[in-house]
Amino acid sequence: MPDELLELREPDGAYARVEEWLRERGFFAPGGEELVAELYLGYGLSRAIRRTRTPSPPEPCAALPLAGCRIGAREWPSSSGGYVIGAWERTWTAAEHELAIEEVRSAIARGDVYQVNLVQHLRAPFAGDAGGLSQRLAALRPLHPAPFVAGDWAVVSASPELFLSRRGDRIWTMPIKGTRPRGAAAELRSSEKDAAEHVMIVDLERNDLSRVCVAGTVRWPELMATRELAGVEHMVSTVEGTLREGVGPAEILAATFPGGSVTGAPKIAAVDLIAALEPVGRGASMGALGVIRGNGDFDLALTIRTFAIAEQEIHLWVGGGIVWDSDPAHEVEESWTKARPLLAAIGSPAPEASLR
């Protein structure tokens, strides 16, 4: 099959358009079981579920579409080229980030939300090869999603978090909430704050899957396990269910995207507050990246720990969940706990002074 690329720049009807485009090319039909497509979904698709009229923040890389889907064989060279990354700049100062966290706490006090995920954005000049960047990240996370490269833009991820997997009528998600530096798993397990934050998201994911699953089949066989992933300690759960007959990819994505661990709870209220507080859009981050097969199965990672490359710049977003008892300074530092291993892995550590 020849290489073909679909790019979408509007959120309305995006999931249905992706499914339709794939069906037109033989997916989800007899004889198409062996077909495979790459799928990228940007966080900006969440605009479709927003309820308030607050304008969405501007996207920092205009060349990046809201969604992309590619079919056809594509091979990476065995030895990808090099790259050069300039000085990193952050969109938020630490003080601005902490002020936004206090705004979330005020919203929680009013009863508007229970938890909100806030992220900050870094950017730097970039020249070179996205494949080389992906190879460097592989040292940090060997099972990271394959990069999505489309001419003038690329998404390269070291995500440790599963957004959604489907095999036949079984579907599952593995949300991550709770982070500590490597070696601090015991501290993470004993944290009441992280446990509360995590259970909120597990409940949200249970609710999302219930919208497309047979009643009574959604369960959580693993709850609050701790694992070392991508250079840090994480708290992870598994939520799974049995899909209703006839449910297709578009309906599944409309019910579940974006992942609850990158929004907060309730999801729609959290998405509205994120749009009001964050100074720039999330671009390639906090979305999904992976593959979808002709038989309807798919594997999609949540695009945390993810770089976007476009217009001779590289972008990274890092953050975490905010609850009532969050300490603003600690939350800002936790975001850098996530960023440091990534920047070190690509050979471009940010100076400590720029992290404050």
Predicted features and spans:
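Extended alpha-helical targeting/anchoring segments
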Residues: 1-356
